[in-house]
């Protein structure tokens, strides 16, 4: 990973289509781009591709120029797609928090606090938390190499708002390190420096800075809406957007999709209730 950054090689990122996946992918992409690396992101279509890495998408990331692909919030059970990439000498790093099998998939590195050989704890972290710790380690190694001698070192604390968002929306226990992440992340959100979160907060008409309830019930559902009935990549591009006007445009699209999702959900519930009542009456 250090070699990829030092040599400014493009990196592929494959993320999950929920908030945890979007925040994780946005963090890695933003960090690498601040270090001078180009990134290519793929978030799968929930209905056409399903959950987790697939060979076609991984090959597409490789064809764009990525010799290294990172999967976030997925990949721990994707044996066949990862094996296919190994056969053509593509390095893969799996960053996940889901429970693995005893046998691990073929990858250059697997970062998962639920590995049976992990004795450092952190089993309650979501992918965003694991990703943040990964970036801390990567940043430390780059510093040792003197990579930041003539360039600005990324401020890792800027990503804690994304860590907090992913942590709350993935409904992991808010204890220990998770609690610290969320507390610090909410403080950073008050500064409104992430244009994506700022735009979502404004569109959600929050009367004050986001709290855990706002993350879980206002911001999170809007980000998830893209993966459920629209473009699954909207969420991650919103969270890494550096242009305030573009961020507002993306947030508006997600808000519209969320309204559509709520309408469809209500309509479906009404149909189901009607069918049940009909069966009972008969």
Protein language model regions, located:
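Active-site cavity-forming subdomains of large catalytic enzyme subunits
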Residues: 59-128, 132-144, 148
């Amino acid at each position: 990973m250090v070699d990829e950054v030092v040599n400014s090689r493009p990196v592929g990122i494959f993320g999950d289509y929920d908030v945890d996946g979007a925040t994780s992918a946005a963090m890695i992409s933003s960090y690498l781009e601040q270090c001078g690396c180009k990134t290519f992101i793929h978030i799968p279509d929930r209905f056409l591709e399903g959950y987790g890495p697939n060979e076609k998408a991984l090959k597409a990331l490789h064809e764009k120029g990525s010799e290294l692909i990172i999967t976030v919030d997925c990949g721990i059970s994707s044996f066949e797609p990862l094996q296919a990439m190994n056969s053509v000498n593509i390095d893969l790093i799996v960053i996940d928090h889901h429970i693995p099998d005893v046998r691990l998939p073929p990858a250059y590195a697997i970062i998962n606090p639920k590995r049976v050989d992990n004795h450092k704890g952190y089993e309650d972290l979501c992918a965003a938390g694991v990703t943040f710790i990964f970036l801390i380690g990567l940043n430390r190694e780059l510093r040792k190499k003197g990579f930041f001698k003539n360039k600005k070192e990324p401020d890792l604390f800027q990503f804690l708002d994304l860590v907090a968002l992913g942590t709350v929306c993935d409904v992991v226990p808010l204890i220990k390190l998770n609690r610290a992440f969320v507390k610090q992340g909410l403080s950073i959100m008050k500064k409104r420096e992430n244009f994506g979160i700022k735009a979502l907060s404004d569109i959600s008409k929050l009367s004050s800075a986001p709290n855990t309830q706002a993350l879980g019930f206002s911001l999170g559902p809007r980000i998830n809406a893209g993966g459920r009935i629209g473009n699954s990549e909207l969420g991650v591009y919103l969270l890494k957007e550096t242009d305030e006007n573009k961020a507002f445009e993306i947030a508006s699209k997600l808000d519209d999709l969320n309204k559509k999702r709520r309408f469809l959900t209500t309509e479906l519930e009404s149909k189901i209730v009607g069918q049940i009542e009909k069966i009972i009456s008969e």
